[in-house]
Regions:
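Alpha-helical transmembrane-bundle signature of multi-pass membrane transport and export proteins
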Residues: 1-422
Length: 422
């Protein structure tokens, strides 16, 4: 399953990177790039908690079959409309939103299935290995996207007809559609059941189940604080959608350079995930989490100030490395403190924070950048100010949340839940 998931992730990363470049060549607008984040986050906010509820009440394997099939269909549609020259900005936004909606159901079921496949003692290593696969995809996907775009047409001039300029984009979307096939075959043949055993005293009513999941998350301090820091740090520092501006106007690197810059966080993240998979983190992992977020903010500032390709590349790699270390800590904490029967709902709530933060951050960055006459200057201001905001949030939580500073997962156990009867 790991290999087929890796192939699918490469395809997904290719499409994500291509969407931003697609929007840039259609509009040449920083705000339009920022709106991609809004288009992606709205379905997450609407559907992710429901997706978590579905993951806790239905066979997770079957849910994944439906969601993976839906994302295949969306990728095919994107490829067809792009190839035919019918790729309006509105249609690109709509299909991007459809992918995000499917992901809101896919992610809780996928993440909640992992703890059923490995022993608890191996969970941190398993999560790190999965992150390694994701980061390999985060390197290969953007790099392949840049090479395909550079080898076909690159960016179209502002105001020019785009017919003939988007053949590379169509190819990327078709490749993503094909990449889902291996996962679907694996899911159909997977022997492990995705069904869960409902805990004694757990509510049967879907609305009551939803309330139970929300009550668990928001009455567990370590979950609340880690999700809060995750949201605000990525909200302020979220700026990957502005990379087409940096590649095209600041660094003059073109589509190939754009692909490598988008791959840079994946390279750093791969280093971080491989290291965490073979080395135990020190005690009080909460402090590791806080320092990782601080480095994330500092690297973001460096990225915004840089005017050299390799310094920008290195800063983005450090962004990926620090983010991966914090992600390993966050995900392990959440899985260890959450009972299996509640993992889907917890993951659904977490998706609002985990994915909502960076996507809304893209909108914020695009809006700030659009306030300046020069897209290059506006993008730099947006990124640097976001990095400063991340440092301030990390400092605030470090001083106010002892449960995070002192957290040590060696003492963590899933909470006894539900503790109340219906």
């Amino acid at each position: 399953m790991a290999f087929s998931m890796l192939v699918s992730l490469v395809g997904t990363q290719m499409q994500n990177v291509a969407i931003d470049w697609h929007v840039w060549i259609l509009t040449r607008s920083p705000l339009a790039l920022g709106l991609v984040g809004l288009v992606r986050v709205v379905p997450i906010v609407i559907f992710s908690i429901v997706g978590g509820l579905v993951a806790d009440r239905r066979d997770r394997r079957r849910v994944l079959i439906v969601t993976q099939s839906a994302m295949t269909l969306v990728a095919l549609t994107l490829g067809v409309v792009t190839l035919l020259g019918r790729d309006t900005i509105g249609l690109v936004y709509l299909l991007t939103a459809c992918t995000s909606a499917a992901g809101a159901f896919d992610n809780p079921s996928r993440q909640s299935l992992v703890p059923r496949l490995v022993p608890e003692k191996d969970l941190p290593g398993a999560l790190a290995i999965l992150l390694s696969g994701f980061q390999v995809a985060s390197i290969g996907g953007p790099a392949l996207t840049g090479l395909i775009l550079a080898g076909t047409a690159g960016a179209a001039p502002a105001g020019a007809s785009l017919h003939g300029h988007t053949g590379g984009l169509a190819l990327i979307y078709f490749l993503n559609a094909v990449s889902f096939l291996g996962v679907l075959v694996t899911l159909f043949t997977l022997q492990t059941s995705g069904e869960i055993t409902r805990a004694e005293g757990a509510p049967e009513n879907p609305l009551a189940s939803l309330k139970e999941g929300l009550r668990f998350v928001f009455t567990t301090p370590i979950l609340v604080w880690t999700m809060t820091l995750d949201f605000f740090a990525t909200f302020f520092a979220g700026s990957m959608s502005l990379l087409p501006i940096f590649a095209d106007q600041v660094l003059k690197a073109g589509p190939a350079g754009y692909g490598w810059l988008r791959a840079a966080p994946g390279i750093g993240a791969l280093i971080g995930s491989v290291w965490t998979s073979v080395h135990s983190l020190p005690r009080r992992q909460g402090r590791v989490f806080l320092w990782a977020v601080a480095v994330y903010g500092a690297a973001t500032i460096t990225f915004g100030l840089s005017r050299g390709f390799w310094l920008t590349f290195g800063a983005l790699a450090l962004v990926g490395l620090s983010d991966t270390i914090s992600t390993v800590v966050r995900q392990t904490v959440r899985q260890l403190v959450t009972p299996d029967a509640l993992r889907g709902r917890m993951t659904g709530v977490n998706m609002i924070f985990f994915m909502g933060g960076p996507q809304l951050g893209e909108l914020e960055a695009g809006f700030v950048a659009s306030l300046f006459a020069s897209a290059a200057l506006g993008a730099s201001v947006a990124v640097v100010s976001g990095g400063v905001g991340t440092l301030l949030v990390a400092a605030f939580i470090a001083t106010r949340a002892k449960v995070v500073r002192e957290y040590d997962w060696s003492a963590a156990r899933p909470s006894a839940w539900p503790q109340e009867k219906k």
